[in-house]
Amino acid sequence: MSVAASASRSASTLCSPQIQQGALKEAKVPPHIWAARHWNLGLRLVPGHASVRAGILVLLIFLPSTLCDLGSVYDSSYETVIPERLPGQGSDDPGGKVSYVLLMQGQKQLLHLEVKGHYSERNFPVYSYHHGILGQEVPLLSQACHYEGHIEGVPGSFVSVSICSGLRGVLIKEETAYGIEPLLFSTDFEHILYTMAHQPVVLCNVTPTDSLGDSSQRQGSSKTDELLALSDLWSHAKYVEMFVVVNHQRFQMWGSDVNTTVQAVVDIIALANSFTRGINTEVVLVGLEIWTEGDPIEVPVDLQATLRNFNLWRQEKLMGRVRHDVAHLIVGHRPGANEGQAFLDGACSGGFAAAVEAFHHEDVLLFAALMAHELGHNLGIRHDRPGCTCGPKHLCLMHETISKTSGFSNCSSDHFLRFLHDHRGACLLDRPWHQSHKRRDAHCGNGVVEESEECDCGNACDSHPCCEPTCTLKVGAQCSEGLCCYKCTFKKKGTLCRPAEDVCDLPEYCNGITGECPANSYMQDGTQCDRIYYCSGGLCKNPDKQCARIYGYPARSAPEECYISVNTKANRFGNCGHPTSANLKYEACSNEDIFCGKLVCTDVRYLPQVKPLHSLLQIPYGDDWCWSMDAYNVTDIPDYGDVQGGTYCAPKKVCMESICTGHATLQYDCHPQEMCHGNGVCNNFKHCHCDAGFSPPDCSSGGNGGSVDSGPVGKPADRNLSLFGVGESPDSRMEDEEINLKVVVLVVPIFLIVLLCCLMLIAYLWSEVQEAVSPGSSSTTSSSESESD
């Protein structure tokens, strides 16, 4: 039986959107559409037709094997349940078994669960970026959370849940999938149990590749002592060591939180194992890299190109750092026509052990099936043909249309056995967590600060002022890199290292004992800002500000009439939903959702620099124009022209996935009057960030403000002195200001004295001149008078 994970919220998925043309027919003045010329990426805009003139360049160096397309997913119903754990079972049970009773649709159901193996190496490395520097952390995860089992008395049922913080996972009962997850902040152990209804989910077109080369290049080909006879290969347990990379957009979709991202990936791996167990194979997470500050490679809509770029990055940056059998990239954007790409037979090869999957929705069950499907291609498994079976199911996991409640077919088993035979499966036979080395030892000189290293200057050690080539700090150095490190010493405690960038953002300060700035913190989602708007992700989701960010001041959100004209047209310039297949159309916005489709702006005085395949729509409105943008085929953000999630759309309502819904969806549960004694706000870690004059954790006593997450705030007199860049020291700034003050104190009086002396001299000279002139005038007059006599 094969299943995957629960989803806290489900969403429709994009399938190769077909561009719908057409403008606003009722407009008296025809609308103008502006598109960037492909041969000129500058600021100049050129008028064009309603369609974007774009040439498609298909460049295939290595031809990946799958072209996958997801359908739509939605939650149909839910109920609140309270799972009751039967006494005398659990972690103390040597068998690792536990049972729960819960009420499903009015009937008591007994869940029998058993702990499953660890699907990650102990202390696997997590890499992330901090101001351009790649660092490594070790996650703190419980090793015995994932349980699987069945529902008593229900044939064919299956349960896969994590039980460490409530029950979170999926239940399969009578061909129906249910998601279960704990209700946040419930004091009665309440959970949400919801039906996960769905349409056919994944469509794939397989294209075989012959570019892998001979098997002599594969990992482990020389380990002849580990090779097993063909008859033993199938029964022998196999392990796929998978390294996962999460791109920046998907990281943002997980709240830009490293811990949340790590836990989500661990859950996905555990649930993918529910599928791969059918071929006696376990997927083991050996490492994770999160692109926290942006993607180091180009991640286009075409996942075939993304796979090519990712594989080159993997060969150059990853292979020498962490050993892996396959590496998978999780991207967060809606792809063009394909939801996944993988190299066929790529596992265990040094050159082609890669795959890419799009996770732009929130159906973890569906995504786990997609990951297992793409991994199947890495393991040599092709698409099922007519006649392939997997028990009573009509569609199996490797069919072109994937069912997330089915498993591998008999044909898949044959393909996998052939892969093991042809390539001897050497890399799949070692049990990762039984090895003496959990991962590669720290490699000094790779530019990554790893365990046991104080610093790593890479190839720049000769000129590095703080770090030795041996990856140790130089004598007298306290640090090497970081926002709180200046000239190899820690910046002063309380120094501002990351200022607030929005009214919903919060500042961070150095603690004086490390070179790193604390993790970014901001006001909890749902905090009110600018009177009627709400904070989300550290930004005040004000549509006027969004327009100003795109078009510059004084652009603002357009009147309701413009939104109605644009967002009811159901085309790429105005809609409340992308097509879910090539045969469907864009969705028009209803009256309730009219402000949640495309962002419409007015008072536009400056046009933005239009990127390739971006288009602007200009329509008349009174004496002005209204503007809409389509970021078709651009993946740096979901769609720059869409109204952002969390944006105000009606009193006490916000936009979320093109729907105007209650602001409760932001899950704001802070009571600052009680939690922070009215002297602060709640941050994204659900801790108080205190106002100046009060101290954390609850803002009830005097202090300098801040939170337990922000680092200690400096004294008010020091705060202005801390507003310096990475390359400036607070001490040097203070010294400069002292020098300037001395100069002012000395120069100004001297200048005044000199000026006074000059004035006095001028006055004296002027008086002398007057005295010299006056006697001469008198004598002349007298002489004249004498002569006249």
Swiss-Prot record:
Keywords linked to the UniProt accession: Disulfide bond, EGF-like domain, Glycoprotein, Hydrolase, Membrane, Metal-binding, Metalloprotease, Protease, Signal, Transmembrane, Transmembrane helix, Zinc
Membrane topology: Single-pass type I membrane protein
Database matches in SMART domains: ACR, DISIN
GO MF entry, a single one: metalloendopeptidase activity
SUPFAM superfamilies, sorted: Blood coagulation inhibitor (disintegrin), Metalloproteases ('zincins'), catalytic domain
Domain (EGF-like): residue spans on this chain: 666-700
Enzyme Commission code(s) on record: 3.4.24.-
Cytoplasmic side: 764-789
Active site: 374
Residues holding Zn(2+): 373, 377, 383
Signal sequence segment: 1-68
InterPro entries according to UniProt: ADAM_Cys-rich, Disintegrin_CS, Disintegrin_dom, Disintegrin_dom_sf, EGF-like_dom, MetalloPept_cat_dom_sf, Peptidase_M12B, Reprolysin_adamalysin
Residues that carry a glycan: 259, 410, 633, 720
A Pfam family assignment: Disintegrin
Disulfide bonds: 348-427, 388-411, 390-396, 497-517, 670-682, 676-688, 690-699
Cited function: May be involved in sperm-egg fusion.
PANTHER family given in the database record: ADAM A DISINTEGRIN AND METALLOPROTEASE DOMAIN, DISINTEGRIN AND METALLOPROTEINASE DOMAIN-CONTAINING PROTEIN 1A
Binding partners and assembly: Heterodimer with ADAM2/fertilin subunit beta.
Protein name: Disintegrin and metalloproteinase domain-containing protein 1
Organism: Rattus norvegicus
